[in-house]
Amino acid sequence: MAAATGDPGLSKLQFAPFSSALDVGFWHELTQKKLNEYRLDEAPKDIKGYYYNGDSAGLPARLTLEFSAFDMSAPTPARCCPAIGTLYNTNTLESFKTADKKLLLEQAANEIWESIKSGTALENPVLLNKFLLLTFADLKKYHFYYWFCYPALCLPESLPLIQGPVGLDQRFSLKQIEALECAYDNLCQTEGVTALPYFLIKYDENMVLVSLLKHYSDFFQGQRTKITIGVYDPCNLAQYPGWPLRNFLVLAAHRWSSSFQSVEVVCFRDRTMQGARDVAHSIIFEVKLPEMAFSPDCPKAVGWEKNQKGGMGPRMVNLSECMDPKRLAESSVDLNLKLMCWRLVPTLDLDKVVSVKCLLLGAGTLGCNVARTLMGWGVRHITFVDNAKISYSNPVRQPLYEFEDCLGGGKPKALAAADRLQKIFPGVNARGFNMSIPMPGHPVNFSSVTLEQARRDVEQLEQLIESHDVVFLLMDTRESRWLPAVIAASKRKLVINAALGFDTFVVMRHGLKKPKQQGAGDLCPNHPVASADLLGSSLFANIPGYKLGCYFCNDVVAPGDSTRDRTLDQQCTVSRPGLAVIAGALAVELMVSVLQHPEGGYAIASSSDDRMNEPPTSLGLVPHQIRGFLSRFDNVLPVSLAFDKCTACSSKVLDQYEREGFNFLAKVFNSSHSFLEDLTGLTLLHQETQAAEIWDMSDDETI
């Protein structure tokens, strides 16, 4: 209990200090602000709290901060008074401990003192109830350290009590109390608020009048000895006023001590119990106003809150157990990502990455590693497609599966992978589809049943690709990548392809076709005046995204059944165990780099020659391909143009697919590779090549 030193002959006036009350929502909002907005900024921030004068007996005078404390325009709860504060959030616990508390208190006290001297506190009495909040948020452990300060100016002289505090019902009649309630409510309604921190009172036996502080000269005109003021009082103690009275008495002494000898104070407490309003427990007392000589210097101030042990020190709250585990997981998942934006990559657009919807075709070694890396980047929407079941050889290389998943013939990979992602992080939207992808050279016309099943599989795949933003091709065979490559090219979806050899790998992005409504000569969205065309496209530099090749563009034969007449080591993907981890990680990093480029999938491809140049994005280069050689621990970044006779992305194939749909696809599935080669012109190319070789041989023989 804080006290003002009193005259030896009179009682001392004591005040009940505020007790801080911080809602869990405040700490959650501070966490979000720290991660997303404040980062390393330690500059003071404006915040807002409130206090209430209607609490039940026994509760302390609380200053409450909720999740809305950071929104200065947020409405104050009904029948509560606002309190304006300043937040000092430090970056380290050491900074929190060594912060100059005395200086912070003096700065806040000076602001209050200036508002008293200038008269702005009369216009806006909320300025008398400022507070400070010094914090440090340990976002790894969810430990929050804080120290409140409620600056209170100290008068140079004592504030002797002329009449000690008594209940309002001992000084006012029932009629006067009802008149006070009515007058207060009318004033609040006139001002458009539900509570007033301070107000003037004038009363006699028959009436009670109230007014705003700024009208004191007219309101008290003719009074010479005593004035009466009302204070919205959050304290419940019968003998002591709350903290908001302290700075008001300094204002009264500074401005009115030459005109009035004393101030009668009504500590207005407005409680509703069992549906009945009651203000009779308010207290009223009279204090003598000391003469306060004019001084430009701010009076001494106090106000730092004591901790739970009653000593001068900060408090700490541990929210790691009481916060919602799913919200904790979500915040923790994003923690490292958002820390990148603080200092290392301040221009990183995480929203583009987190919101992207990824379709993973293949839930094997590559699919598992890609999924884990996507989760590391905060991607929330991941869908698996696979038709295989988990075998005993899988769990050691495929990190989403365990030994139990192999029992009973094995769980479907796609469903098990999606289920495991949700167990790892409940906030992810993971789905699995146990389905086959029809392939060239793998006939589906054995019966009407197989043909209809293939039709359903194609329709399902088309719907999945349409509903996702990025498609990852992570299957075992080359021909299984053909159908999704065609569909994705037709739907203008970004495709990231990863394939493994024994000690080599390729990771690439497919060229992104121009939007269908644009002609061949039109520019791509956001593409700066066909920059690649102006610079001159070559095989090595300045190739824009719409001219890049796909996985099949370097082939001169159509994909077929690659598993026929193959031994076991040729049918299985036999590669060095670390290769899938490397390729899977690079596939995701390539996607993220593409998303960070302002032109997205239309970005000009970076090559090995660009490694010493200024990178096009905050994360670095945006290559077309990454080809790795683990035997040499080396990577190269080749770039290749789209092939006009490509069996997957050429205009002839896409036009045929868009016109005929499944009928065209069924021909590809049921025919040999010559069908696609005839369609695209590869057959003619082979014939021309053979003819050229014959002519070369003839010339040699002649010579």
UniProtKB/Swiss-Prot annotation:
Gene3D superfamilies: NAD(P)-binding Rossmann-like Domain (3.40.50.720), Ubiquitin-like modifier-activating enzyme ATG7 C-terminal domain (3.40.140.100), Ubiquitin-like modifier-activating enzyme ATG7 N-terminal domain (3.40.140.70). The keyword Acetylation applies. Keywords: Acetylation, Autophagy, Biological rhythms, Cytoplasm, Disease variant, Isopeptide bond, Neurodegeneration, Phosphoprotein, Protein transport, Transport, Ubl conjugation, Ubl conjugation pathway. Coiled coil: none annotated. GO terms for biological process: autophagosome assembly; autophagy; cellular response to hyperoxia; cellular response to nitrogen starvation; cellular response to starvation; cellular response to stress; defense response to virus; macroautophagy. One of its GO terms (cellular component) is secretory granule lumen. It is found in: Cytoplasm; Preautophagosomal structure. Induction: Expression is up-regulated by the transcription factor HSF1. InterPro entries: Atg7, Atg7_N, Atg7_N_1, Atg7_N_2, ThiF/MoeB/HesA, ThiF_NAD_FAD-bd, Ubiquitin-activating_enz. The keyword Ubl conjugation applies. Widely expressed, especially in kidney, liver, lymph nodes and bone marrow. Changing residue 511 to D: In SCAR31; results in severely decreased LC3-I lipidation to form LC3-II. Changing residue 261 to R: In SCAR31; uncertain significance. The modification N-acetylalanine is found at residue 2. The modification Phosphoserine is found at residue 698. It comes from the Eukaryota. There is a cross-link at residue 45 (Glycyl lysine isopeptide (Lys-Gly) (interchain with G-Cter in ubiquitin)). A motif (FAP motif) lies at residues 15-17. Pfam families: ATG7_N (PF16420), ThiF (PF00899). Homodimer. Interacts with ATG3; this interaction is essential for the transfer of ATG8-like proteins's thioester from ATG7 to ATG3 and plays a role in the conjugation of ATG12 to ATG5. Interacts with ATG12. Forms intermediate conjugates with GABARAPL1. Forms intermediate conjugates with ATG8-like proteins such as GABARAP, GABARAPL2 or MAP1LC3A. Interacts with EP300 acetyltransferase. Interacts with FOXO1. Belongs to the ATG7 family. PANTHER family: UBIQUITIN-ACTIVATING ENZYME E1, UBIQUITIN-LIKE MODIFIER-ACTIVATING ENZYME ATG7. It is linked to Spinocerebellar ataxia, autosomal recessive, 31: A form of spinocerebellar ataxia, a clinically and genetically heterogeneous group of cerebellar disorders due to degeneration of the cerebellum with variable involvement of the brainstem and spinal cord. SCAR30 is characterized by global developmental delay, hypotonia, variably impaired intellectual and language development, ataxic gait, tremor, and dysarthria. Most affected individuals have optic atrophy. The C-terminal part of the protein is essential for the dimerization and interaction with ATG3 and ATG12. The N-terminal FAP motif (residues 15 to 17) is essential for the formation of the ATG89-PE and ATG5-ATG12 conjugates. E1-like activating enzyme involved in the 2 ubiquitin-like systems required for cytoplasm to vacuole transport (Cvt) and autophagy. Activates ATG12 for its conjugation with ATG5 as well as the ATG8 family proteins for their conjugation with phosphatidylethanolamine. Both systems are needed for the ATG8 association to Cvt vesicles and autophagosomes membranes. Required for autophagic death induced by caspase-8 inhibition. Facilitates LC3-I lipidation with phosphatidylethanolamine to form LC3-II which is found on autophagosomal membranes. This is Ubiquitin-like modifier-activating enzyme ATG7. It comes from Homo sapiens.
